[in-house]
Amino acid sequence: MRCLPVFVILLLLIASAPSVDAQLKTKDDVPLASFHDNAKGTQHKRIINWCCLVFYQCC
């Protein structure tokens, strides 16, 4: 009998959880991976620019 309240609470939590398809994708949605790729590219450009300013030989 002690497990019954826990079981009921879990059922309520599962039922109220948002589903994966809660929001439909639009044409403006961008995958998160592209943001990470852009950040890595920007960071790489900054490192190269800094290297060129400091050492002059890596350009």
From Swiss-Prot:
It is found in: Secreted. Keywords: Cleavage on pair of basic residues, Disulfide bond, Secreted, Signal, Toxin. The lineage of its organism: Eukaryota, Metazoa, Spiralia, Lophotrochozoa, Mollusca. Its main location: secreted. This is Conotoxin Sr5.4. The cysteine framework is V (CC-CC). GO terms for cellular component: extracellular region. Residues 23-44 form a propeptide. Expressed by the venom duct. Contains 2 disulfide bonds that can be either 'C1-C3, C2-C4' or 'C1-C4, C2-C3', since these disulfide connectivities have been observed for conotoxins with cysteine framework V (for examples, see AC P0DQQ7 and AC P81755). Belongs to the conotoxin T superfamily. One of its GO terms (molecular function) is toxin activity.
